[in-house]
């Protein structure tokens, strides 16, 4: 009789999808209202003038303009602001 051993089973082979976090638009770049600037977990970057913060802490542009990153306050928070384009 021909016999074939049972194939082994593996307990590996699973991995979660990458979350694609990080800075999406950099300082000096021109953005349109609604463009995503930073995707993050928690407020690594804080919203400044003309920047909104979503419920998942995503920072996005509220007006068209140029992005500016700066460090402010005693806590040295990284703040993202948008200098509006001249209308």
From Swiss-Prot:
Keywords: Ribonucleoprotein, Ribosomal protein. One of its GO terms (molecular function) is structural constituent of ribosome. The keyword Nucleotidyltransferase does not apply. GO terms for biological process: translation. GO terms for cellular component: cytosolic large ribosomal subunit. It comes from the Bacteria. PROSITE patterns: RIBOSOMAL_L27. The keyword Transport does not apply. Belongs to the bacterial ribosomal protein bL27 family. HAMAP family: Ribosomal_bL27. This is Large ribosomal subunit protein bL27. The lineage of its organism: Bacteria, Pseudomonadati, Pseudomonadota, Betaproteobacteria, Rhodocyclales.
């Amino acid at each position: 009789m021909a016999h074939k051993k049972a194939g082994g089973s593996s307990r590996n082979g699973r991995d979660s999808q990458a979350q694609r976090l990080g800075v999406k638009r950099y300082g000096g770049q021109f953005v349109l209202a609604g463009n995503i600037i930073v995707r993050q977990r928690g407020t690594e970057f804080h919203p400044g003038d003309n920047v909104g913060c979503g419920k998942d802490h995503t920072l996005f542009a509220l007006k068209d303009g140029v992005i500016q990153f700066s460090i402010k306050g005693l806590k040295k928070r990284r703040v993202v602001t948008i200098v509006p384009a001249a209308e």
